[in-house]
């Protein structure tokens, strides 16, 4: 807190001589009333603040006004501001305050974002082109056989999830889990041959948007029939045999003796 020692000669030119007429606004002097009211004043440099004295005694100007000011700014003079600072003036200052830098997005390690994405899914059953249903045979094997009547309750209900993969107009990547079981169909290499298996998973982590490639199948629709191509082994498909009660397997031929065409029936969850 410092007091103005004396009025500068430039300031005296605006002084009315009547002490009761001289008031300053807080954080000013942005505008001085009475003899100063027509002048829009501001500091040449920031940092000067004025405090109002609300008591008008017969005291000199020196005792009526106190100035809050940084010591290094005491020598600064008050000059008329050319115009009021507008919001749009900020646009001219921003390039001097901020330095523009390019931002590079590393897409190699975005698994966390993908895992947090919601997974769209549905429940369904599958039958091959001969209307054979898929049922469990042992803890980790599926077989295809004809079912009728109440036996249809034995067929497996799949939990089909739409996952990340190489999607195109005719291929939709999906994962096939078994409802109410922690099992997913997966494709692995056994004895140098692509093989279909049921793999146990942790239900806390599955299903997820970005499934490991061995779990992903490209769902292909042709003439109202569906094919399921392994994403891990292209041109290998979920297949059934012409014979009854044979295991479901991964086959490398289409349109041959092995059946690769299926129909899907939706099941309420």
Curated annotation (Swiss-Prot):
Protein name per the record: Interleukin-1 beta
Gene3D superfamilies: 2.80.10.50
SMART domains, sorted: IL1
Protein's UniProt keywords contain Cytoplasm: yes
GO cellular component: cytosol; extracellular space; lysosome
Origin: domain of life: Eukaryota
Database matches in InterPro entries: IL-1_CS (IPR020877), IL-1_fam (IPR000975), IL-1_propep (IPR003502), IL1/FGF (IPR008996)
A GO MF label: cytokine activity
Presence of the UniProt keyword Cytoplasm in the record: yes
GO biological process: cellular response to lipopolysaccharide; cytokine-mediated signaling pathway; fever generation; immune response; positive regulation of cell division; positive regulation of immature T cell proliferation in thymus; positive regulation of T-helper 1 cell cytokine production; positive regulation of type II interferon production
Gene this protein is translated from: IL1B
């Amino acid at each position: 807190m410092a007091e103005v020692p004396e009025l500068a000669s430039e300031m005296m030119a605006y002084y009315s001589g009547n002490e009761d007429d001289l008031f300053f606004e807080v954080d000013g002097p942005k505008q001085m009333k009475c003899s100063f009211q027509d002048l829009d004043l501001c500091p040449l440099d920031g940092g000067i603040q004025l405090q109002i004295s609300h008591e008008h005694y017969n005291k000199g100007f020196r005792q009526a006004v106190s100035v809050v000011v940084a010591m290094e700014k005491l020598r600064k003079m008050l000059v008329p501001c050319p115009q009021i600072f507008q919001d749009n003036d900020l646009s001219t200052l921003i390039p001097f305050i901020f330095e523009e830098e390019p931002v590079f997005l590393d897409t190699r390690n975005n698994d966390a974002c993908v895992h947090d994405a919601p997974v769209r899914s549905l429940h369904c059953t599958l039958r091959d082109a001969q209307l054979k249903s898929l049922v469990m045979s042992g803890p980790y094997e599926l077989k295809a056989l004809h079912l009728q009547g109440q036996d249809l309750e034995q067929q497996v209900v799949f939990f089909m999830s739409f996952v990340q993969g190489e999607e195109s107009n005719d291929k939709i990547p999906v994962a096939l889990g078994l409802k109410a079981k922690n099992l997913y169909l997966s494709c692995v290499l056994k004895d140098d041959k692509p093989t279909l298996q049921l793999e146990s998973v942790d239900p806390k982590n599955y299903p997820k948007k970005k499934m490991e490639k061995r779990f992903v199948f490209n769902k292909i629709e042709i003439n109202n029939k569906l094919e399921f191509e392994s994403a891990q082994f292209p041109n290998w498909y979920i297949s059934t045999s012409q014979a009854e009660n044979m295991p479901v397997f991964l086959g490398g031929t289409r349109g041959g003796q092995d059946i690769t065409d299926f129909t899907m029936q939706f099941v309420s969850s």
